[in-house]
């Protein structure tokens, strides 16, 4: 049944949903990678589509920016639409010298400066981790397709424009491979509701080198990430 934020019919979604942050990217994925895509939501302009990838039913829906927005949509998808598996397909920054622009990074866990997981976890630190089965299949698929991927810990931040030099040094020291604004929240909601989640991202910004993929080049740069994510769904 429709929720406060998703006005789709009960069986409109697949049990596997790819979730970019940007609704325009959700539309792009549906129109360029799925067969027979049907738009199933446009409430608050959070576009959602269901179609088929190699005869497997797949949905794609945007989750917006930040943990609160992403957590809200993930929760409603799992509780009201029986979604079992979430793959975040998005962008992230990096600070590691061995990781380059357009590289694919997979988050096996995510630390955060947000308080939301502490609120959920009775003011204790929660280890927000990806589902192992999904990591395994994504890594195996990447090897089979000869895609170079980096797997490690993310840092999910509430503050997009705050770049403390001291904090960046700490993140680099602890081998954080990706910085985003959603993964820690998505992993916590999925764990709480007994679902599976994984973030597969493309590096769009190297924060220390101050280098970035241009807005014009972003869609074409993310082909491998989207293909890897879709091929992974075939094993789930």
From Swiss-Prot:
Keyword Glycosyltransferase recorded: yes
Highest rank taxon of the organism: Bacteria
Keywords: Glycosyltransferase, Transferase
CDD domains: PNP_EcPNPI-like
Catalysed reactions, as listed in the record: a purine D-ribonucleoside + phosphate = a purine nucleobase + alpha-D-ribose 1-phosphate; a purine 2'-deoxy-D-ribonucleoside + phosphate = a purine nucleobase + 2-deoxy-alpha-D-ribose 1-phosphate
GO biological process, one term: purine nucleoside catabolic process
SUPFAM superfamilies: Purine and uridine phosphorylases (SSF53167)
Binding-site residues for a purine D-ribonucleoside, renumbered to this chain: 5, 180-182, 204-205
Ligand binding (phosphate): 21, 25, 44, 88-91
GO cellular component, as recorded: cytosol
Pfam families reported in the protein's UniProt record: PNP_UDP_1
Active site per the UniProt annotation: 205 (proton donor)
Marked site positions, Important for catalytic activity: 218
Gene Ontology molecular function, alphabetical: purine-nucleoside phosphorylase activity
Keyword Transferase: yes
The EC number(s) this enzyme carries: 2.4.2.1
Its biological purpose: Catalyzes the reversible phosphorolytic breakdown of the N-glycosidic bond in the beta-(deoxy)ribonucleoside molecules, with the formation of the corresponding free purine bases and pentose-1-phosphate.
Description of how the protein assembles with itself and partners: Homohexamer; trimer of homodimers.
Protein family membership: Belongs to the PNP/UDP phosphorylase family.
Protein name listed in UniProt: Purine nucleoside phosphorylase DeoD-type
Taxonomic source organism: Buchnera aphidicola subsp. Schizaphis graminum (strain Sg)
